[in-house]
Structure formats: structure tokens, C-alpha cells
């Protein structure tokens, strides 16, 4: 254990004592690089738990500022950071929790023009976005780049999580081939969301990330996990890989990233 400082041995002692983690596993976490899309309801708990676990490099991208309505569920922010960029607020929170962690704050919008450059040096991508254009863009980019993706979504009292391993299982388009028509599915702003729900789903996403880094346990490959907060139920839905999927199928028809946002706005 000489590769750890005394502080690290204490900080990560509950990890190191686990046979499935140990010193080698903790080193994997410290050397890992994770890219989180969104510093809101899902990105906050994902980043917080990954920072606590000692994931060495965490990048977050988000173009928004902290608003009072965020504080009902976005645990990395506070009244002291109102009006400040969400990524800077989250960076300060995570680095205050664990100075071992390098948090890279990117205050900009993810797009087809920058996503491949952003994710190329990261081991795992986490999607904590709150809109369909971003969700499809992230899925397609990760499939094309061969990057594992942990995707989460929340609305009202329900959340879902799935893990996508390009070349070894389904992708988001195997589940939902095309975006729903604009306006069909309301946003959290329009329909609301239970404040604790992002914590449950974000915690599950963080768990998937840690298992991927450690190479332990079973991840949600070819499965969609659905949580209902009102009923306190979890259920798994099988999601087989679609051989005719336009992105990850045998003969993909989508071979370059599209301007999903413009397409979605046009549908509105």
C-alpha cells in the first residue's frame, strides 16, 4: 500500500477492505477519467459520488447558471452559487469533498462539432442531460467512438438507467430508434420531478461507472432499469441489440453525427 498516502489510506479504507476493490481497484479509480454531460439533477449526484470514490479525473460540461429552482434537487449547488456557472459550482463542491480529484469544468454546449473531441480521452461517458437531442447525440457519438455510456433519465416520479457498451450490446436507438415528436414528452420544467429522484438515479449511474472501472459485477447491458418512486419498485426491461439499428446495427445508416437540435427545433 506504499503507493497511497496516509490520508488516502484513511479516506478510501472502506473501499480497500472490500475484496472486489482492494488497493488495485482503488488505483484504477484514481487513474480513471470520466466525462459527465450535464451538471444538473443527475450530473450532481453522479459527480459527487465519483469524486467521493476517488475517480481521478472528472469532466463536466453544461452551459447553464445556477437558478433558485435548481436547488430542490441539484445537490452540488447552493444559494451561495446562484447565478454562477453550474460547472464551476459543481467543481468547487467536488474538489472541496476530495482534493485528490481533478475536476474539469466546461461551460459550453455539447454539439456535433465538439463532442468527439471532448470524449476522446475519457474512459467512460455519463449522460445526465435533460433533452432528447442531446441524448441521441451522446448515444451516437459514444457508439462511433467506442466509449462506454451510462445513460439516465428522470421525469415526475420515474427514472431509468441503462449502460451501453459499443460493440457488445444495445445502444439507445435499439430501445428508441427515433426521437419522439417535439412536445410529446414534457420536460421536468413542464411536468415536475420529485426532488430526491435524481439522487436515486444518479446514484445508480455512479454505481454503473464504478463497476465498469473496476471490472466487477454486472452492468445494465442489454437492460433498462426503471424505478418508480411512488410505488417504490424497480423493474428491468430486456433490450436486445437490434441488428437493424441505424447506428450500431450490421449496416448502419447513420455514420456521422447529425444536427439533432436543429432537427428537433424544426419539429416544434
Where in this protein do the model-derived segments appear?
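Adenine nucleotide-associated cytosolic modules
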Residues: 1-268
Amino acid at each position: 500500500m506504499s503507493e497511497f498516502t496516509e490520508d488516502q489510506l484513511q479516506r478510501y479504507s472502506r473501499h480497500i477492505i472490500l475484496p472486489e476493490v482492494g488497493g488495485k481497484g482503488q488505483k484504477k479509480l484514481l487513474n480513471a477519467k470520466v466525462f459527465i454531460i450535464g451538471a444538473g439533477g443527475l450530473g450532481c449526484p453522479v459527480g459527487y459520488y465519483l469524486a467521493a470514490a476517488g475517480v481521478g479525473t472528472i469532466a463536466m460540461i453544461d452551459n447553464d447558471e445556477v437558478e433558485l429552482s435548481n436547488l430542490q434537487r441539484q445537490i452540488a449547488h447552493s444559494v451561495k452559487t446562484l447565478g454562477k456557472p453550474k460547472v464551476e459550482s459543481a467543481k468547487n463542491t467536488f474538489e472541496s469533498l476530495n482534493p485528490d480529484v481533478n475536476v474539469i469544468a466546461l461551460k459550453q454546449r455539447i454539439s456535433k462539432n465538439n463532442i468527439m473531441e471532448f470524449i476522446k480521452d475519457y474512459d467512460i461517458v455519463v449522460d445526465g442531460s435533460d433533452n432528447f437531442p442531446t441524448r441521441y447525440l451522446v448515444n451516437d457519438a459514444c457508439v462511433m467512438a467506442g466509449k462506454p455510456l451510462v445513460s439516465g433519465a428522470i421525469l415526475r416520479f420515474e427514472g431509468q438507467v441503462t449502460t451501453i457498451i459499443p460493440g457488445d450490446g444495445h445502444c439507445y436507438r435499439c430501445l428508441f430508434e427515433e426521437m419522439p415528436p417535439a412536445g410529446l414528452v414534457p420536460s421536468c420544467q413542464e411536468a415536475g420531478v420529485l426532488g430526491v429522484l435524481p439522487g436515486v438515479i444518479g446514484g445508480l449511474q455512479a454505481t454503473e461507472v464504478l463497476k465498469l472501472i473496476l471490472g466487477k459485477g454486472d452492468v445494465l447491458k442489454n437492460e433498462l432499469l426503471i424505478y418508480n418512486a411512488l410505488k417504490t419498485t424497480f423493474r428491468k426491461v430486456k433490450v436486445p441489440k437490434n441488428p437493424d439499428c441505424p447506428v450500431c446495427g450490421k449496416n448502419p445508416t447513420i455514420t456521422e453525427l447529425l444536427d439533432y437540435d436543429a432537427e428537433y427545433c424544426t419539429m416544434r
